[in-house]
Amino acid sequence: MDVRTALMELAEAVKRIINDRINRYGVNPRAGKNTLQNSSLQSSINVTVQEEGITLQIADYWEYIARGWKRTGNYPGTMRLFVKNINDWVSKNNIRIGDLKQSQIVWIIIKNIWERGIAPRPFMVYDEDGDLTKMIPELDAYIDKWFDNLFNAIMEETDKYFN
């Protein structure tokens, strides 16, 4: 196994673990069902191999879902991004309330979030430094196995280079 293959294996494991955590923690207490399965958030997960390691890309609002958001009368992030994310969600899920326009439905949802907050669904743990082993606790066990594979791959490449 070469280094790139070992990194690809790690990237796949990270994506699989995040998806497993979404399945485990994705239940919305207000809706009573897992609203994260097959969601835009889940499909936004992209783990790629870079020269320096792996990179995780995920929808910008993941933090508000994972950490929740306390009722403060303020909105998470910028207002434009907040409205866009809610509008996209309403559109994707084809949410209708009587004869209300989509913009009116979006306003009702935003007002509800302002007043009631968002219950946390900790499919990932927030870490300021972006340390994946802190963000995804199950990853630690996998890292040990993966590191052995990576070390062996590096040693093989070193042997090829010097021999």
Give each language-model segment a name:
Residues 35-163:
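Charged, low-complexity interaction tracts
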Residues 1-46:
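Charge-rich, low-complexity N-terminal segments
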